[in-house]
Every structure is written in structure tokens, then in C-alpha cells.
């Protein structure tokens, strides 16, 4: 099933918040993405109905396995693309912004080539090839 870019953004933000704070709250999602709380409520409802997240009434939000897989793929791409753009001389802020746009549409072949280029001569590898 093809997932929308906005849903990928929400899932990625949730993963980052979970890693940074240990929990996912709607208010934090709104702040991270620069959207309104009603927008978050609508997105959370749709993501829950699609099986990407779990949430009890007034309870914490957690990523379901399907949502985690998508979030991890997008976040890995984001990190690798940011590093690649910085390697090209792009400022960190601009690299982050551009990576956020590219991460959704880049082909697997191009992503692998970027990771291979970044990882040449490195011990700690960037990117993951487990995702298509």
C-alpha cells in the first residue's frame, strides 16, 4: 500500500520524538512539524485506523510494527541524505530541509549509490539497504 508523504512525515516525527523523549505526545508532534493540534488529531486518527500506530483513549501514542518500519526507512534516508548534502557543502539547516523533501521520492537505486559514496572508507556506515 502506498502511503502519503504527509503520513511518512508524521511517522518519522513520531520515531524521532520517541527516541528523544521516550514517548510520543500530540502536542510534541504539532511543535515538531509546525502544524495545529487539530491537524495532528486528524492524522493520528487516520494512522491508527490504517494500523500504523497504537493509541488508547487519552493514552500514549506508540508506533505499530508497520508504522515503525516506514518511520525507520524514512528517517534512515533523511540522515543519509542530510550527510550527503553536507558533504557537498550545503549548510546543515538547508541540508535538513532538502533531505526532508527528497527522502520521500528518491529511488532505491539512487539511495544505495548515495550511501555507498558516503560510506567509502568509513567504519561506521550510514544508511540501510533493508528498505525499498
Language-model regions, residue ranges each:
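Basic, amphipathic "hinge/linker" alpha-helix immediately C-terminal to the N-terminal HTH DNA-binding motif
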Residues: 59-77
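Key DNA-contact positions within bacterial/archaeal DNA-binding proteins
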Residues: 38, 93
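N-terminal helix-turn-helix DNA-binding core of bacterial DNA-binding proteins
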Residues: 2-35
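C-terminal regulatory/oligomerization modules of transcriptional regulators
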Residues: 97-132
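Alpha-helical residues within the helix-turn-helix
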Residues: 31, 48-49
Amino acid at each position: 500500500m502506498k502511503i502519503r508523504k504527509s503520513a511518512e512525515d508524521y511517522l518519522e516525527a513520531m520515531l524521532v520524538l520517541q527516541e528523544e523523549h521516550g514517548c510520543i505526545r500530540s502536542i510534541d508532534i504539532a511543535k515538531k512539524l509546525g502544524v495545529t493540534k487539530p491537524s495532528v488529531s486528524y492524522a493520528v486518527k487516520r494512522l491508527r485506523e490504517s494500523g500504523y500506530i497504537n493509541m488508547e483513549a487519552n493514552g500514549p501514542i506508540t508506533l505499530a510494527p508497520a508504522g515503525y518500519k516506514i518511520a525507520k526507512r524514512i528517517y534512515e534516508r533523511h540522515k543519509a541524505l542530510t550527510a550527503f548534502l553536507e558533504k557537498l557543502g550545503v549548510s546543515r539547516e538547508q541540508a535538513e530541509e532538502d533531505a526532508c523533501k527528497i527522502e520521500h521520492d528518491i529511488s532505491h537505486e539512487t539511495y544505495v549509490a548515495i550511501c555507498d559514496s558516503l560510506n567509502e572508507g568509513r567504519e561506521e556506515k550510514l544508511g540501510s539497504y533493508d528498505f525499498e
